[in-house]
Amino acid sequence: MEEPFKDSALELEQAKLAIYAMGLDTTFMVEWNNYYIVEEDILLCKDSINLTSTRQYHATYYVDNYQTITVGVDNTIAQSTNWREATKEAIDVYNKYTGLRFVYNEYNPQIKISKSNLYNAIACAQGEFPLSGKPGSKIIINDSFYKNIDTFLSLSQKKFLLVHELGHNLGLRHTNGLGEGDGGVGLVQIPGTPTSDSQSFMNSTTCGNSWNGASTYDVVALKTLWPKCIISF
């Protein structure tokens, strides 16, 4: 017997309004288990939407700086698929440009990378947004997007994909996002960056792109949000 549908039309509409106020496009928003999926690859936990006002959510939206974040690939993903190598290279990008410290650890990581058949999803992967200063806990690789995503994507393409999804785990939105939400609490432009950047790794619909480095403005954004601590005497 199927589990009864728990969300009323009113609750769903309220969730859409809250998510829109965060600056996210809800045009094709869908429900998946305990999550809402927006902009194809962003996972938002239902409980965090239902229990947190938009202003509170915005205030705790990005992860706190100077914390150690563990990332690991689920042990159900074969070693031969080089997702682990791609993950290690992806976290090196954030270690290079931010005050955050990423460590690869497959034992109970804060961010777990797994695979699932995300039917009807038009994205290579999906990353969960953060809450209360902590990173989103999931990156789900869409095993049904290509016939065999493990062999279809090169190591460089996997690295690009994971750098992008880790950005969502930290609270980064799509660089080419579709505008600001209600009351000025939505899509916030990072100081020193333009309104568009064709080279940004946080542009949407970039699955299949190869890694060519962070753009100049990607680096500005990372250093602005999570600056490294510089000690001078």
What are these regions (language model features)?
Residues 70-75, 105-121:
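Acidic helix-start/capping segments at beta-turn-to-alpha-helix junctions
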Residues 155-156, 161-217:
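The catalytic-center signature of Zn2+-dependent metalloproteases
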Residues 71, 78-103, 225:
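A short alpha-helix/helix-coil micro-patch that ends at or immediately precedes a cysteine
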Residues 97-110, 174-181, 232-233:
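Surface-exposed patches in mature extracellular/periplasmic domains of secreted proteins
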Residues 213-233:
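Short, low-complexity, Pro/Ser/Thr/Gly-rich segments in the mature regions of secreted, periplasmic
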Residues 72-83, 146-153, 157, 206-211:
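Second-shell loop/turn segments in exported
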Residues 83, 114-140:
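Catalytic zinc-binding patch centered on the HExxH motif and its immediate surroundings
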Residues 2-82, 188-193:
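Disordered inhibitory propeptide/activation segment of secreted metzincin zinc metalloprotease zymogens
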